[in-house]
A protein has these predicted regions:
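Carbohydrate-interacting/catalytic domains
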Residues: 20, 62, 76, 81, ...
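Conserved alpha/beta catalytic core and glycan-binding cleft of carbohydrate-active enzymes
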Residues: 1-94, 141-142, 148-151, 158, ...
Length: 246
C-alpha cells in the first residue's frame, strides 16, 4: 500500500511553509492514540514516483530537497526512491503522457544529494526506532518539526528546520545524552565534509531489514558525535538532524 497522503503532505508542507500539514498526517496515521489508522503497519513512502512530478520539480525552494528526504527516512513506512531522484532529476507530469517522468539515463549522475541519501539509508537501516518505532510529535511550528521514533530499546529524534533562519527549539522532553547520527548541512572536518566521510562508511554498512544488526554509530560513525541536550535543540537554517538517545 502506498502512502499518497504523506507524499502530498511532504512537498505541500515545504511549499506552503506549514509543517503542521505533514505532522497532522503522520500523527493521524501512526500516532500513539488507539484511533490512529496505520499503527504497526509499514506503508510504502515516497516523495515522487512514476505517476507524479518529481520532487526537484514540484518543490518551489530547492533548499528543501534534502530536507524532504530527511523527513522520508525519519518517518514511519518503507522509503522508496524513484530512479534519478537520488541526484535531483527534474521532470513534470504532462496532461496526456508521462514521458518526462521516465527518461532513459546513459549513466548515473551521483552528487552531494546522492551521498546524503546513502547516509540516511545507512542510519535508518541501523536504527530499530526508525524502522519499527512509534511516532510522536514533540516540537511543531510552521517552519520546524521535531518528532520522536521509539521502540522499547531505541529512541530517535528527527529535527527538520525548513526556514532560512536558525531556530532554537525548546521543550521539556528534549533532555538526555544523544548521538547526533545525521546532520545536514554537514560540518566540515579536517578538510572533508562529514557527509563525504559518512558516504564512504555507508557502503560498507550491513544491517538486517528490522534494524537489529548494527547500531547507528556503526552505520554513520564519521558523523556521530555525543551531545547533551538540556531542553533545547539548535536547528541551523535548512537543516535535518537525527539524534539517537544513548
Amino acid at each position: 500500500c502506498t502512502n499518497y497522503e504523506c507524499y502530498k503532505g511532504i512537498y505541500s508542507s515545504f511549499n506552503s511553509m506549514n509543517m503542521f500539514e505533514i505532522a497532522h498526517s503522520l500523527n493521524r496515521q501512526y500516532g500513539t492514540e488507539q484511533w490512529c489508522i496505520y499503527r504497526g503497519k509499514h506503508l510504502m513512502t515516497f516523495v515522487d514516483n512514476h505517476d507524479v512530478s518529481r520532487l526537484a520539480t514540484i518543490l518551489t525552494n530547492k533548499n528543501h530537497i534534502p530536507l524532504a528526504y530527511g523527513l522520508l527516512f525519519g518517518m514511519p513506512g518503507i522509503p522508496c526512491i524513484y530512479y534519478g531522484s537520488e541526484w535531483g532529476e527534474e521532470g513534470a507530469k504532462a496532461p496526456d503522457n508521462d514521458y518526462a517522468l521516465r527518461p532513459c539515463f546513459e549513466e548515473p549522475k551521483p552528487n552531494e544529494l546522492t551521498e546524503l541519501i546513502r547516509e540516511m539509508i545507512a542510519v535508518r537501516r541501523a536504527s530499530d526506532a526508525l524502522c519499527n518505532g512509534s511516532y510522536r510529535n514533540v516540537v511543531l511550528t510552521n517552519h520546524q518539526l521535531i518528532f520522536e521514533r521509539r521502540t522499547d530499546s531505541d529512541r530517535m529524534l528527527v529535527a527538520i528546520n525548513a526556514s532560512d533562519s536558525e531556530y532554537t527549539a525548546d521543550h521539556h522532553e528534549l533532555q538526555g545524552s544523544f548521538e547526533k547520527v545525521l546532520s545536514y548541512p554537514c560540518a566540515a572536518e579536517a578538510g572533508k565534509s562529514s557527509c563525504d566521510s559518512a558516504a564512504e562508511t555507508a557502503a560498507d554498512t550491513s544491517a538486517s531489514e528490522d534494524g537489529s544488526a548494527d547500531t547507528p554509530e556503526t552505520a554513520a560513525g564519521a558523523v556521530t558525535e555525543t551531545v547533551t541536550i538540556q531542553g533545547q535543540i539548535v536547528m541551523p537554517p535548512y537543516s535535518a538532524q537525527y539524534f539517537h538517545q544513548v
